[in-house]
Structures are given as structure tokens and as C-alpha cells.
Regions:
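Soluble extracytoplasmic regions of secretory-pathway and membrane proteins
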Residues: 4-489, 495-499, 504-535, 539-543, ...
């Protein structure tokens, strides 16, 4: 049976089970990570019973002994005294668990370890894990930078790489704040999550700056040819570099000198409309998103990093002016980067286009009476509704907005479950259990697109006829592009026929009679609660609230 509202893991559980565990070489233990404690003392003499906690099981818990070489040994009293002073812990000095084979692991953040090895690199704000040849590896992107490149625009790297993710995340940050007019992703680094070993790979072999550093520190780097196919398949275009590029393109997409100096056609990255009102007032930008999609100039869906543009200025009329993507798939061949990796594709919408920007699309979602009613029902009682990322997607010659909606119990151990999907195309809004159904609502029937969640809850798959032209008749702008000679696709299109009286009725979601009954009961219980509260009849109010909770629980069960 397919459980559509929960993620499907390759490996999960404690102890872990899944496809990775089936491999004898898989090492699931993580001693180095962005969230690791300041230090840890590990290791024991050979033959000693293990006492390091591994994972909970039974009343005692499973134990393990670290077998790597991840830190200095502290078996003698002098070393223990030094580290006790450094970390301000008398346990290092007096604990009987510190023995002749003990190692102390510190500097456990992957980014920190790479910075210790290569302090001359500027490091990307996001570190991500991948399983490479059976080992968990943290991947860190490294940049060479300069502020002395002739005839180039100076940019504050810290400001250019800020967005709502860096503002709210404890593990993702912007680039170091410094001015630069030269930046290249010249290095890919990996940190082994088990023993902390660092490997540096030259990614951009043509970069003169990294060539100079290689001469200063011979033997520090592995060559591109040494990157295994397994590691290559996990490498991707880095976010911070893309954010710097999208910031520069807000001005430098203009090719006319007069328009450039007047600034009349400048763009800006939209504020993240899913953030709080306070964050939006501080102009916290929408982050780029990794998506697999087909854009102008690509012949098939490509793993890409994407962002959008709106006109510069403070106008409240927010329309979409451009859509930027970069091919982020590095391929899976040893020592060979994918042919289109790093290709920027800019799709520019016509100046007379009225395609809503992300903020306007979010307002359309919020203003829908049907959407608000059902979200209020889902949020009543002990559940909270969480809006997901607002995604901009090219579809059928136009652009659509997609936003997942999650429901999360108020319990401390609960996690969000996908319950609904919002879709907007022009002024039309779809709201259904799956992306496939929401697209059908927006396009008044068969959207012609087969979404990845088209599989029904019972595991069966609905068949669809490919009618790609259908998806292009709603309210969006065409954005068909052609490749530029410099690796950037600049594309523009014309307005599609946007007659709101034809071809788009909004559709209706299919709903079982039991689910309708449960939602009607919940609606009636809410009315009864309001009436009882106005009368001051708290006994009736409590009874109505009980019925409301029962109806909502039943509705949630029926939707799973």
C-alpha cells in the first residue's frame, strides 16, 4: 500500500534498516556532523568490552567501540590535563573511561574541518551528506575569490547570499561577508562522517587561483580525474554561487546601454511570501530551490537550481519578469563533469505579461474562500497547518505555482504529513490531495501532465492521455528559450490566450461520502461552538468541541 503523505526512505529506523544496510561496507555511525557536540572521547584497548553508546535497544542500549583514527590520543596524564584545561572539563582528567587507547574528537563540524585544512577558501553556507561507497560523506563547496579582478562588479558576498533559509536555519548560513568581484567554485571537499578525514578535489582545473594554491601546497588536492562515479553522482551546483549570480543578473540581464543607465528594466529577487509578515517587511528573500524540470533550451527534465524575478522597486503590483535556472546534475562518470552542468538558463517574460509573481500567487491562495475554509478545518483542534515552499514551475509553455500543505500534530514528537497541494496558473487556483488532482482542477479536466504523486492511496495508478497543449491554455505567459553562446539561455515568449471565461472552470476534487460527512460534522460543530460561546453555555461548548475533535480525527483517518 502506498502511503502518500509520508516520505519513503531508502534507509530508516534504529538500528537502521533498508537498501544501504544490505551492503556489507555501509557504515551508519556518525561522529562528525554540523550538530555534533564540542568534543567526544572514544576508543578502548583491544579486547575490552565496548561501552560507547550506539543506539537504544532494550533496557541497556547497544554499545560500540570507535575503530577509526579521528583525533589525537590522550592516554597520558599530560595530554589529559591540557585538554581538560582547553574544554574546561575535569571529567577528561578524572574519568576512569579515559584509557591508553582513548582519542578525543573535536572540530567536528565538517565546514570547520575544511576551513582548518584550507583556510584560504571561502566555503558555501550549506553542507550536505551523501552515502559514497558505503560511507557517509559531508560535501562542502569551496570558492576561490578576489577583489582585484579588472573591470568587474564588486559584490558583498554575504549580502548576496542571504535569504529566508539562512535567516531561519541553524545549519545553513550565508557566505562570509566580504567584497569580491571574482568567485569560482574551484573545490569540492568531502568529510568522512565516521573518522573526520578531509579530501579536497580540484573542481575547476582552469582556475588560475587554485593552480597557485596547488603550487604552494603540493599534494593537498586530488585531481578531478580521481572523483569516483559514486561521488560525482551526488555533487551539485552550489546555492551560494547561484545566489550571487542571480543578484548580478538583476541588472546585467539588460543589454541596452541606455536602459542600463536609466535602470528602468532592473529586476529583483522576490521576498519569500511564506515567511512571517515581520520577515517580509525586512525584505527577507526567497531562496532558490532544487527541482527536476524541463526549461527552455533543455530537451528533457534536468536536475536544476531555480529562482524567479520581479520588477525592481517598491510597487505593490508584483508580476513575474524572469525565471532563472542552472543545470545542477554533475553526472555519474568517474572524473568527468556532465556536459551541461553549470549552464544558466534565463527565461525572460514579455514586458506586457501579467503573470503573477510569488507574492501575488501566495495572496491568491490565501484569498480563496474554499482553501481558507478547508485549512481552518484542518487546523482546528490539536493539529497545525504548515505551508511548504512556494515553487515556480514551467509547464505546458507557461509557469505554474505549486505549494504543498502539511498537517502536524501539536505533540513534541510528531512530524509534518503532506495533506494537500495548492496549484495556481494565472488567476486559477487548484487545491486537492495530490499535485496531479490539483493540476486537473486548474486546467478544467485533464491537465496533460503526469505528476509524480499520480499514484492513488491504494497503490493503483490512474492512466492519463498526454494532451500537452491543454496545459498552455490557462493564464500564464509562454517562455520558450534558445541557448545562448555564453552558456546562458536567454528566452522570451508571448502572452498566451488568457480568456478567463473559457477553458478553465477550476474543477472539483473527488471526495468520498464518508469524508464529506466528517467535514460537514466538523463544520456544524464549529457553528455549535460559536453559538454556545456567545450564550455562555460552557457545557454545550465543551460538548461541541469534543464533537469537532472527533470529526477532524475521522476526516484525517479517511484521508490517509
Amino acid at each position: 500500500m502506498c502511503i502518500r503523505d509520508r516520505p519513503k526512505f531508502f534507509e530508516a529506523g534504529i538500528p537502521t534498516q533498508g537498501k544501504l544496510t544490505e551492503s556489507e561496507q555501509y557504515e551508519p555511525r556518525i561522529y562528525f556532523s554540523p550538530n555534533a557536540s564540542e568534543y567526544s572521547i572514544v576508543g578502548a584497548p583491544e579486547g575490552t568490552q565496548s561501552w560507547e553508546f550506539d543506539y537504544p535497544t532494550g533496557s541497556e542500549g547497544a554499545t560500540n567501540t570507535f575503530g577509526g583514527n579521528g583525533g589525537p590520543k590522550i592516554g597520558n596524564i599530560f595530554s589529559r590535563l591540557l585538554y581538560a584545561i582547553r574544554f574546561g572539563s575535569d571529567q577528561i582528567l578524572f574519568s576512569n573511561r579515559v584509557n591508553s587507547a582513548s582519542q578525543i574528537l573535536y572540530d567536528r563540524s565538517p565546514k570547520e574541518r575544511v576551513a582548518k585544512v584550507a583556510p584560504y577558501l571561502t566555503l558555501d553556507g550549506r553542507v550536505y551528506p551523501a552515502v559514497v561507497d558505503g560511507r557517509v560523506k559531508w560535501i562542502v563547496d569551496g570558492y576561490t575569490t578576489s577583489d582585484a579582478y579588472p573591470y568587474s562588479q564588486m559584490t558583498d558576498l554575504g549580502e548576496a547570499s542571504k535569504d529566508s533559509t539562512t535567516e531561519s536555519s541553524a545549519t545553513v548560513s550565508e557566505l562570509a561577508s566580504k567584497n569580491a568581484n571574482y568567485i569560482r567554485n574551484s573545490v569540492k571537499a568531502t568529510v568522512d562522517a565516521y573518522d573526520g578525514s578531509v579530501d579536497l578535489y580540484v573542481w575547476d582545473e582552469s582556475d588560475p587561483v587554485i593552480k597557485a594554491w596547488q603550487k604552494i601546497f603540493p599534494g593537498q588536492y586530488h585531481q578531478l580525474s580521481e572523483i569516483s562515479g559514486d561521488l560525482m553522482s551526488h555533487l551539485r551546483y552550489p546555492e551560494s554561487l547561484f545566489k550571487v549570480q542571480r543578484e548580478l543578473l538583476t541588472k546585467y540581464h539588460v543589454s541596452s546601454a541606455s536602459q542600463f543607465f536609466s535602470g528602468e528594466d532592473f529586476w529583483q529577487t522576490p521576498v519569500d511570501p511564506t515567511e512571517s509578515q515581520q520577515a517580509q517587511e525586512r525584505d527577507i528573500l526567497q531562496p532558490p530551490y532544487y527541482l527536476t524540470l524541463q526549461t527552455g533550451g533543455s530537451n528533457e527534465p534536468v536536475f536544476s537550481l531555480t529562482s524567479s524575478y520581479i520588477p525592481a522597486g517598491t510597487s505593490t503590483r508584483e508580476i513575474l519578469t524572469g525565471f532563472l535556472s542552472v543545470d545542477s546534475d554533475a553526472g555519474n562518470e568517474k572524473g568527468k563533469i556532465g556536459a551541461n552542468y553549470g549552464t544558466l538558463r534565463l527565461q525572460e517574460l514579455p514586458k506586457d505579461s501579467n503573470v503573477p509573481g510569488p507574492g501575488q500567487a501566495q495572496n491568491n491562495f490565501n484569498a480563496s474562500a474554499d482553501v481558507s475554509k478547508e485549512l481552518n478545518l484542518l487546523e482546528s483542534g490539536s493539529t497545525n497547518v504548515q505551508r511548504g515552499n512556494l515553487l515556480t514551475l514551467p509547464l505546458g509553455g507557461g509557469l505554474v505555482y505549486v505549494q504543498p500543505v502539511y498537517v502536524k500534530s501539536s505533540g513534541s514528537t510528531s512530524f509534518p504529513l503532506l495533506k494537500k497541494v495548492l496549484v495556481a496558473f494565472g488567476d486559477q487556483v487548484g487545491f486537492a490531495n495530490t499535485l496531479d488532482e490539483a493540476l486537473d482542477q486548474v486546467f478544467g479536466g485533464n491537465s496533460g501532465a503526469s505528476a509524480g504523486d499520480a499514484e492513488n492511496v491504494d497503490g493503483s495508478t490512474s492512466s492519463k492521455t498526454d494532451t500537452s497543449d491543454t496545459a498552455g491554455t490557462g493564464g500564464g505567459a509562454s517562455a520558450n528559450g534558445s541557448s545562448g553562446t555564453d552558456g546562458t539561455d536567454s528566452s522570451s515568449g508571448s502572452n498566451s490566450n488568457n480568456d478567463s471565461s473559457s477553458g478553465n472552470t477550476g474543477g472539483s476534487s473527488t471526495m468520498s461520502s464518508d469524508l464529506k460527512s466528517a467535514l460537514n460534522d466538523a463544520s456544524q460543530a464549529m457553528k455549535d461552538s460559536d453559538a454556545a460561546m456567545k450564550k455562555g453555555d460552557w457545557s454545550a461548548y465543551g460538548e461541541a468541541q469534543k464533537k469537532l475533535q472527533e470529526a477532524l480525527n475521522k476526516a484525517l483517518e479517511l484521508e490517509q
